Each structure stands twice: as structure tokens, then as C-alpha cells.
Amino acid sequence: MINNNSLKEERLTSARSRYYDTIVIGGGQAGLATGCYLKKQGQDFVILDANERIGDAWRNRWDSLRLFTPARFNGLPGRPFPAETYYFPTKDEMADYLESYAEHFQLPVRTGTRVDRLSRRDDRFVIQAGDLKLQADNVVVAMSNWQKPRVPAFARGIDPEIVQLHSSEYRNPSQLRDGAVLIVGAGNSGAEIAREVAPKYPTWLSGRDTGHLPFEIGGLAYRLFLARLIGRVLFHRVMTVDTPIGRKARAKLLSKGMPLVRVKPKDLDAAGVRRVPRTVGVQDGQPMLEGGRVLEVANVIWSTGFHPGFSWIDLPIFDEGEPQHERGVVASEPGLYFVGLTFLYAASSSMIHGVGRDAEYVVKDIQTRQRRSWQSEGLERLPEREAQHKVPSRAKDIAQP
């Protein structure tokens, strides 16, 4: 007698446990570029992304955000960004481009899937995402170093009547209370938000001077030669981990961040933004600056960056929270790769136009690794598969019998 409940459970178990040649974790620009090269190689793979929609990592930034790079540098492999050469896309336009890219190449992106744990069992990687369990010979972690908002512990002592937002939560000035605004962190996000907020509220910008680029992006000199010189030559070919100047720049970038790109000190002055020292603590519920000055504010925006956020990777590959790799290849865990990290190989590695080169490099390594495996088994090429895996696009789909 057939037990229908047993058959149903067997189908559910099969749906929740699958094997792939390669699993890509992260469906942003790094993951999609990797997917493009994997598809060209005929790989059996899937891309997992925690967001409900491709491009949401861009959509969920502040409303007025525009990219620092013009359209000519914002295309992924095989598909240029659809805009005039020196147009600076909005964050929503970038998000829509990524979505159309995945559709154009028919990449198998499974959205709404947050990975809880990556571990290893024998010669395969195991990925746990809710009740979904996947296995793979190769895993590409395709995301940036900066995943979890960083806010100093002393922020808990700030008066609860004061609005506190991290820059990842800020959308526009309508979120703020009437009264003064303190923006902590004087990098690019802090400077851009400060200039936007200052016409509406008294605004302080707290933090060290990060320096700034000595030219206007989008200006005549930038269009004539600086864009190509910086984007294609300096950031992409000169400033790499293979050169002394690149290694020095990498250390500085990872420790201090980028200089101001679009918003310059003169722009902050013109907007009425007041510069103050670092914020180091709290006194009587109000933020206190280095030197002891206390500011009375109604709002605090923490533009203090992000932590790596790789705690879900249960593998011994980290040194002070950063994955140890060589050009994205983790030698201590064969088959594990990274794409999208800040200065993974070059200054352009975390930029749209630079991520494709790193993706191509790791996919070639995956192919080489597979070829060696086949040869060790006496095969000249990968055997034909009986069927390609079909992947549901939403977590709810996987629970269907």
C-alpha cells in the first residue's frame, strides 16, 4: 500500500536538498558577473540572494544616491549600461540594470534566500538557508566586505528622544525630527547626506578629514581624459596587489576609506555644514566630541561604515575578520572563492567595471579544478547530465509538494 504522506515528505526532502557544481552566494553585481561566466562554461550552478528582488541592495539606499562612476564604467560583462557615456546613474537605475542583466542572460537567481551557514563535509561544501540544504563542489561568496552596519557601543546611551539612524537606514530628510542633526563619519556617505540635510536643519559633520579628489567628476577634464586614466588605467591596472603603489593604496583604503569623490569641502561649506571633531562618547544623553564638547541635537545619523558580516561562514579562513585569499582563491579551502571584496585584486575590484575581471579569474580556476578532478577519474570531460536542476525563485515555492 502506498503511503501518500511518505511520498509527499520524500518530494519535500528532495526539493530541500540539492547538489550543484557551484553555488554563488550574493546576487548583486559580483554574483551576476560570476554567473555570466559560469553559464558560458556550461556549469550547473545557482545564485542565492537574501533580497526579495534582484538589485534591492541598490534600491534600499538613500533616495538621492547616484553612482560615482559614469555609465561607461557601469556595465557588467557582455552588456553595457544603457545610458549616455558620461551619465551618472541613480541607484534605482543601477538596480533595474542588474535585474535586466539577470533576465537577459537567464541566470538562475534564487531570491529571498538568506544563507545561515556555510560549512564543509568531506569534499563538498554544505549550505544551510532556513530549511533549504544545498551541497556543492565550489562556492563563490560574491559580496563586499561591508555587510553589517557599524555603530559604536556608546550610542546606546543617547537620549531615546533623539532619532538615530545608520546611513543604511537613511532615505531622505523627512525621517528626521525638527532640530539639529549630527552626522558621525565624514566619508562619502556622511558628506553626501550632510549636504542634503543642511538646507533643512542645522547640521554638524563629525569625523576626520578623509581628503578629496582634486577635480570635479563630470567636468571637462574628467570627460576628456581623467575618467579613462583613472578608471581603466590607474584603478584597474596600476593599483593592484602586484605593485608596490597598489599594496600601499590597499592598506590605506582598507584602514581609512576613500577620499571624498563628488562632495568637496567647499560644497559642505556652501551648504552650511559645520565640521566638528570625532564623536567619542555620550554625556547626559547627548553626543560628546573629542575634546569634551557636548552637542544638543535632535538627530544622529551614523555614517560609520560596516562590519564584514561573514559570521555565517563556518570555516577557518579568517584573520581579524577578513577572509584570507589570493586573488579571490582560498587556498586553505579548495573550491572556495570570493568576488566583490574591496581591493580583492585591484582598486577597481569592488567597482562595477572591475568586478568582471575578478569573476572571470575565479571561474577559470573553478574550471581548472574540475578538469583536474575529471582527469584523476580517467575522464576527458564532464559526463553529460541526465537533467538540469530547476530552482524555485522564492522560498515559499520550495514547500510545494
Regions found by a protein language model. Give the residues of each.
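Flavin (primarily FAD) cofactor-binding/catalytic cores of flavoenzymes
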Residues: I2-G27, L32-N51, G55-A57, Y86-P401
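Redox-cofactor-proximal catalytic regions of oxidoreductases
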Residues: R53-G78
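A short small-residue
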Residues: L76-P80, G340-T342
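A short acidic, helix-capping loop that chelates divalent metal ions and anchors anionic groups
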Residues: P80-Y86
